[in-house]
């Protein structure tokens, strides 16, 4: 489904996360990376997961932390599930990094009984 508008919002601001899906964008991207302090990353994952699981009129994506960080796996493990339409992966430097993330998402989907993709 093509979309014209994307709205990014920091995933650690409960009020913004609550309202962003009603702003009229075709897709919403909740940011877990640069906008979130290290100490807030676990709580942000939970907030974003809950927001993505609610009914909404648009696509819901998460911008996770880069594969070279210690946070990427935790982000994916927390978020791959119902309601997540896709992942925005920052700072990809090689095709192998993208293949690794694709493989990891596929494994999490299979473990959780979700359809691939």
Regions found by a protein language model. Give the residues of each.
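Expand to "…catalyze enediolate/carbanion chemistry for C-C bond making/breaking, isomerization
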Residues: 1-117
């Amino acid at each position: 489904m093509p979309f014209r508008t994307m709205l990014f919002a920091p995933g650690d601001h409960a009020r913004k996360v609550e309202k962003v899906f009603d702003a009229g964008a075709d897709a919403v991207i909740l940011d877990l990376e640069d906008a979130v302090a290290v100490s807030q990353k676990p709580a942000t994952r939970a907030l974003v997961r809950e927001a993505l699981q609610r009914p909404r009129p648009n696509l819901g994506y998460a911008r996770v932390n880069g594969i070279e960080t210690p946070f990427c796996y935790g982000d994916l493990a927390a978020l791959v599930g119902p309601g997540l339409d896709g992942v925005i992966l920052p700072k990809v430097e090689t095709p192998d990094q993208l293949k690794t993330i694709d493989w990891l998402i596929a494994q999490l989907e299979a473990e959780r009984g979700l359809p691939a993709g």
